[in-house]
């Protein structure tokens, strides 16, 4: 039980840290003054981690509800 709670808290903390980490980065220059404006997707890992965090938080909430009902 304590392990599950600790794991959920760890996942939530990691989500918060990851979101704070991603706010300071600038996209690369990419030659925009020369007309080279290609669409590049930079945040694939962020979306994957946010999906994992969402799954973890939903799972934790479901576990807490089942524990409260017992």
Curated annotation (Swiss-Prot):
<keyword id="KW-0527">Neuropeptide</keyword>
<keyword id="KW-0165">Cleavage on pair of basic residues</keyword>
<dbReference type="GO" id="GO:0007218">
    <property type="term" value="P:neuropeptide signaling pathway"/>
</dbReference>
<comment type="function">
    <text>Ligand for the neuropeptide SIFamide receptor.</text>
</comment>
<protein>
    <recommendedName>
        <fullName>Neuropeptide SIFamide</fullName>
    </recommendedName>
</protein>
<dbReference type="GO" id="GO:0005576">
    <property type="term" value="C:extracellular region"/>
</dbReference>
<feature type="signal peptide">
    <location>
        <begin position="1"/>
        <end position="22"/>
    </location>
</feature>
<comment type="similarity">
    <text>Belongs to the FARP (FMRFamide related peptide) family.</text>
</comment>
<keyword id="KW-0027">Amidation</keyword>
<keyword id="KW-0732">Signal</keyword>
<feature type="modified residue" description="Phenylalanine amide">
    <location>
        <position position="34"/>
    </location>
</feature>
<keyword id="KW-0964">Secreted</keyword>
<feature type="propeptide">
    <location>
        <begin position="38"/>
        <end position="70"/>
    </location>
</feature>
